[in-house]
């Protein structure tokens, strides 16, 4: 009789442990809600195949280099330095820069030097030396389809080439990737650039989702009176887009931002939230290699 009661008691205890209820001493579900920020889950169930291949984020930033964003600004509108935030979190990013900013004695370079004592060229050299990637965002930063209609395809191709030359002159590295301003470029010009060896980034559904940029919409959050900024915050808007892609089985993302002080301010929380979801941060070149190895 006593032995029977003991066996029953052991069975009940084991059942409680295996049931997984934290309330009765069981083990919590590893795929629970995780940390939640502003209603967006920062931890998500992940297929075992993705865990083996890796959950990847490539952070990219357009329109620089802007030293006051990269290294921070003080005064009436203080802002954290984007490069300092990335370094502190052990994240390497890719910068799609505008060639004219890397030309000595331009207004942009003089303006930055006067304001924070660092020129655009100096900023690019510093970051390249710290392991960041620099890629092509044209020389002139104008809308390329309009430029092609007015000036011809050769002008567009030459402007992209000038941007690449400016980057190589400063960093010593030939750009391999190109992002058109606002992703707007004619099919013919894009084909020609790809023929010349560029990978042209896009948001078009013509490409697999893993190779499409995720538009952060951060430019809508800039200025004193932003209109259209994702709610409740920029980082939550990005996380929602990541969640939507995860629901479609996509766990690799190229996130497209701009060199803006408001974006730099959002980065610490966004990086923490993405790390909590199991993501690893890589440069764009590393991302492309790893995604290719996954067969995406």
Residue ranges and their predicted role:
Residues 67-68, 102-105, 142-146, 184-189, ...:
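Short catalytic/ligand-binding loop motif for oxyanion handling, primarily in non-cytosolic enzymes
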Residues 9-17:
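Bacterial N-terminal signal peptides
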Residues 19-25, 30, 86:
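Signals and flexible motifs at protein termini associated with secretion
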Residues 34-51, 87-90, 129, 261-296:
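C-terminal domain-boundary segment and adjacent tail
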Residues 140-171, 184-251:
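Alpha-helical scaffold elements lining the catalytic groove of polysaccharide deacetylases
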Residues 31-136, 140-148, 158-174:
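Active-site beta->alpha N-cap acidic-glycine motif
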Residues 57-61, 93-97, 133-138, 175-180, ...:
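Structural recognition of the beta-strand scaffold that forms the well-ordered cores
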Residues 1-9:
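Bacterial N-terminal signal peptides that target proteins for export
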């Amino acid at each position: 009789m006593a032995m029977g009661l003991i066996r029953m008691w052991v069975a009940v205890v084991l059942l409680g442990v295996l049931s997984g209820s934290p309330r009765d001493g069981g083990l919590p579900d590893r795929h629970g809600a995780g940390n939640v920020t502003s209603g967006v889950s920062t931890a998500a169930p992940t297929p075992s195949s993705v865990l083996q291949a890796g959950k990847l984020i490539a952070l990219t930033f357009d329109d620089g280099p802007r030293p006051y964003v990269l290294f921070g600004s003080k005064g009436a509108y203080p802002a954290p330095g984007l490069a300092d935030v990335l370094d502190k979190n052990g994240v390497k990013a890719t910068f799609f820069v505008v060639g004219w900013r890397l030309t000595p004695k331009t207004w942009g370079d003089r303006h930055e030097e006067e304001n924070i004592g660092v020129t655009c060229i100096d900023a690019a050299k510093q970051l390249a030396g710290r392991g960041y990637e620099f890629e092509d965002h044209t020389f002139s930063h104008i809308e390329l389809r309009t430029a092609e209609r007015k000036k011809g395809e050769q002008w567009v191709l030459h402007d992209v080439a000038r941007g690449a030359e400016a980057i190589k002159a400063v960093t010593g590295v030939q750009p391999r990737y190109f992002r058109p301003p606002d992703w707007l470029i004619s099919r013919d010009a894009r084909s020609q650039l790809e023929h010349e060896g560029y990978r042209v980034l896009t948001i078009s559904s013509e490409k697999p989702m893993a190779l499409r940029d995720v538009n952060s919409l951060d430019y809508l959050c800039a200025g004193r009176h932003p209109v259209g900024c994702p709610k409740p915050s920029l980082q939550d808007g990005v996380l929602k887009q990541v969640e939507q892609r995860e629901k479609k089985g996509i766990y690799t993302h190229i996130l497209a931002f701009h060199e803006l002080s408001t974006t730099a301010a959002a980065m610490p929380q966004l990086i923490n939230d993405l790390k909590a979801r199991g993501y690893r941060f890589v440069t764009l070149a590393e991302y492309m290699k790893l995604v290719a190895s996954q067969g995406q």
